[in-house]
Amino acid sequence: MKTFLVTAFILLFITLFVISESYPCTFFYAATKKSVLFGNNKDWISTESYVWFCPPEKGGYGRILFGFEFFPGQKEPSSGVNDQGLVFDLGWTSNKERTGALTGETFKGNIFDKILEECSSVDQVLELLKKYNNLQVQYTYLVIMFGDKHGNSLIVDRGQVRAKTTRFQIVPDDSKAAEPCTQYQIAHSLLSSADEISIDLFKRILASTHVEASRATTAYSTICDLKNGKLYIYYFHNFMEEVVLDINEELTKGYRTLELGSLFPPSVAEKDFRWLKNRELEEKKEKSLAKTKSREAFEHISGTFVNSFDPEDSVVIGFENDKLYITSADKSKVELYPESLTKFFIPLANGDWNLTFAKGESKNSSTLVAEHEFLGMKMRYERIK
């Protein structure tokens, strides 16, 4: 699983996100002659979010990325901004049918990181998307927004591109829905009635559209001042605590990854939410362990499997002290928990991986299908030994 995540995103993330139709992420862009701002609420099932800083190198642009860890040691961006004033964010859509024509080749890697590294404007993003078909092949269940400091933005939804036609754009884009969702209604009302756009206005919109629920919460929020290169960060829907970063200044400090919560004072609400989610994980494990059979019953899944899409991506499944583990090509290792003789899961804070094994002609399982419970990621692995 060198790319349990990268390959997954080759069929997918991150991000980020619609947990269900009840909790869509909210992000929006607005531009006037004076200001160009972007804001987002990242609604998710976990607060274990990260920010990583990638300084410019080899002619590429520097960028700051936000995201989650969907497999131990493997983080994927769900939003980000570069030092040229280009920003992106993504969310889930319930309609996964592709409507755009399929063109171009598939880029093996994270297309969003590549866009921020190579593009400085929405026009350049469009040119790159003509070359690569990732958004049409892998991301049909994502709605993605790109915006630049020049006043241009667009939404890519199931392969279709919608450019900004007024001074702002909003996701979820429910402008044609019979009953627009609450987040859209609030954001649209505040943006359309404002004489000027400002950081205070965007903060007000984020505060009014954030989510607090046992299932999902607003893990983090950001406002990007694209003309002035400033980044405003809020953690766990607390808009009283604000971290302001100068994008160019931060990128001079070198490459680094931080847990987003480390930038903020401790929060009782966040601690309680994290405790609740950890308890849910432990309960899942306990239920699974109650089904555990003898080691011999699971011997048929031991072995090495290679990804059908990417031969460099392989996983090894084996026993240690009578416990089953799956190890990726980069040596990340996690325990497998049984649901039956052929179905297993990996309980993680950012969503479980469900693994299904199928037997071939021999007594051993010949194929493995790994699927993320929320993200729609599905990968097929074939046994090689």
Model-derived segments and spans:
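Short, low-complexity Ser/Thr-rich regulatory SLiMs
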Residues: 28-31, 224-226, 319, 357-361
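Secretory/export targeting leaders with adjacent low-complexity proregions
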Residues: 124-140
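C-terminal, well-structured catalytic/ligand-binding subdomain of enzymes
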Residues: 23, 30-75, 79-117, 140-142, ...
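Peripheral terminal and inter-domain segments
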Residues: 280-385
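Bacterial N-terminal signal peptides
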Residues: 8-18
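A generic alpha-helix structural signal
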Residues: 126-129, 203-206, 302
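Extracytoplasmic/secreted envelope proteins and their assembly/folding machinery
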Residues: 109-116, 122, 126, 302
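Bacterial N-terminal signal peptides that target proteins for export
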Residues: 1-9
